């Protein structure tokens, strides 16, 4: 069971051939505050997984053996970037990020019946391409940055704005498949 509304996470599981269902957790991400980004994403992932796991019906959901919660943020120059609040914030962030590096952090929480909860954060370094103001404005005008942690989608138009990665590709999309393989 994927405890996420993210279409990108669903696509990752589908492409990897991992059968799953989706239930949105309903967790208000703004209610969970933490100064340290690694702990923040772990707490959010845990809250999402626990919210869905607690709502499982023992009789109707008996075939569900695991619940996976995830949450991602970009750690950039000491700040935590979730989804931009609007186009102005997205442009301001991209003006700072262009030509620099940031760490995309994804918290993962796997809850299985009668097994210990598994909680982890996977980090991937993202090298952003140097972009002109016109390139930044065109990308933000596409609307894509407003839907993604950090304000970019590696698997979409945002891939054109990235020079490279150090770490897990799928983690930047929202779920580390190598991590998931090791815990399943």
From Swiss-Prot:
Q: What class of enzyme is it?
A: hydrolase
- Highest taxon of the lineage: Bacteria
Q: Which SUPFAM superfamilies match?
A: ITPase-like
As recorded in UniProt, its EC number(s) are 3.6.1.9
**Keywords assigned:** Cytoplasm, Hydrolase, Nucleotide metabolism
Gene3D superfamilies the record matches = 3.90.950.10
A GO CC annotation recorded here is: cytoplasm
Identify the catalytic residues: 71 (proton acceptor)
Q: List localization entries.
A: Cytoplasm
Gene Ontology BP annotations: nucleotide metabolic process
Keyword Hydrolase in annotation: yes
Function, please? Nucleoside triphosphate pyrophosphatase. May have a dual role in cell division arrest and in preventing the incorporation of modified nucleotides into cellular nucleic acids.
Q: Which NCBIfam families match?
A: maf
Similarity section: Belongs to the Maf family.
**Official protein name in the record:** Nucleoside triphosphate pyrophosphatase
